[in-house]
Regions:
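Non-catalytic connector elements of ABC transporters
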Residues: 80, 91-200
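Residues located in well-ordered beta-strands
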Residues: 60, 72, 84-86, 144-149
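C-terminal boundary and immediately downstream tail of ABC-type ATPase nucleotide-binding domains
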Residues: 66-91, 117
Length: 200
């Protein structure tokens, strides 16, 4: 139950690697309770997500991270960007919480889909000629970057847009100048759009 919660980062990461090796050699069943999505992804082949004592989803860890199915499960797996939607086509939605931006999906949007999600690392930055070329090619899912806020972490920039979308961009510990970090547009590939059910 929360085996690493009171440890500093260095010790926690080392012990997680050790536990991963122990579990790989263990032939029985083990149960781990955690709120840390990295622990789940690294240590568990299968997961069960609970909300107020009810099972939201259970199954293969990687499959659930790739397709969490419900809004609550998406949040628990770390998805920062979730918006209610209006279905406007078989493969097209309007994101009501993100200034009514329209998105094309790679899967059919069923009547039971209430929201979409986009993970903060799943955006492609675009600027200058790239933007022009994408627009001329009729590319979809282009998001203008308006009034961004930038926050620096040791190995990432957190960029939040005025419409509430989060983008996380990798950086090195030696980089502190935010100039050039923010592009004109972001693009979300249709395959990166999570189709979600249930309440936000």
């Amino acid at each position: 139950d929360e085996p690493f919660s009171a440890m500093d980062t260095y010790l926690r990461e080392g012990l997680r690697l050790e536990l991963s090796k122990v579990l790989a050699d263990y032939d029985g069943v083990s149960v781990m309770v955690t709120h840390d999505r990295d622990e789940v992804f690294q240590l568990c082949k299968n997961i069960m997500l609970l909300d107020k004592g009810h099972v939201l989803i259970a199954g293969n860890s990687r499959k659930i991270f790739q397709d969490p199915v419900t809004c609550k499960a998406a949040r628990l797996t770390g998805c920062k960007n979730i918006s209610k939607i209006e279905r406007i086509g078989e493969y097209r939605v309007r994101a009501l919480d993100w200034d009514n931006l329209e998105f094309v999906t790679d899967r059919t949007v069923g009547d039971d889909i209430t929201a979409i999600g986009i993970r903060a690392h799943d955006f492609e930055p675009l600027a200058g000629e790239e933007v022009k070329a994408k627009k001329e090619a009729g590319e979809e899912n282009l998001i203008p970057v308006v009034d961004p806020s930038i926050s620096e972490m040791p190995f990432e920039w957190y960029i939040t847009l005025s419409n509430g979308l989060w983008w996380k961009k990798e950086k090195t510990i030696h980089t502190h100048d935010a100039a050039g970090v923010v592009p004109e547009y972001l693009r979300a590939d249709p395959s990166a759009i999570l189709l979600l059910k249930g309440e936000l």
